[in-house]
Amino acid sequence: LRGFRGDSEAAHEAFLFHEHYVWCDARPRARIGTLEVRPSCQQPAELSWTPSALSLGLIEAADDVEAFIEGSVGGGSWEKLMLYRERAVKAGIHAPEPAAGFLRGLLDLARKGLWKRGFGEEKFIDPLEDVLEFREGSAANARRAFERGGTQELVSEYAIN
């Protein structure tokens, strides 16, 4: 966008033209007015709605989520959350949480946000209860399937019939 200094309209148009190349976990789609949650398409079939429901629940409870983060993580929360993200990329669910009960608190707030909507969508985040309790998710299950029998076992276990 360097070539567009001083021309905010041209810079905005260039951004809109190229923004679909940016790979984020979640991003606004300006042209169509939606929020795209990319990890949703990478889940086993029975969990396909879980990331979207979790994201929606957190958005619906945004004020409570913000207060929870500030209250539990404290000052410098952005830096602490970025460090947590880095650790979670490497260690997954086993990464030390930035505060005791952090994930439990976020899941409870997401559930509350979905419940307030009144559509019964909170059922879509139920599988995350097991992830929190057993500290293991679908990626670990897929890894075990692959270790047992390679690609054939993995496809056999996760193929949509």
Regions found by a protein language model. Name each.
Residues 1-161:
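C-terminal accessory/tail domains of diverse enzymes
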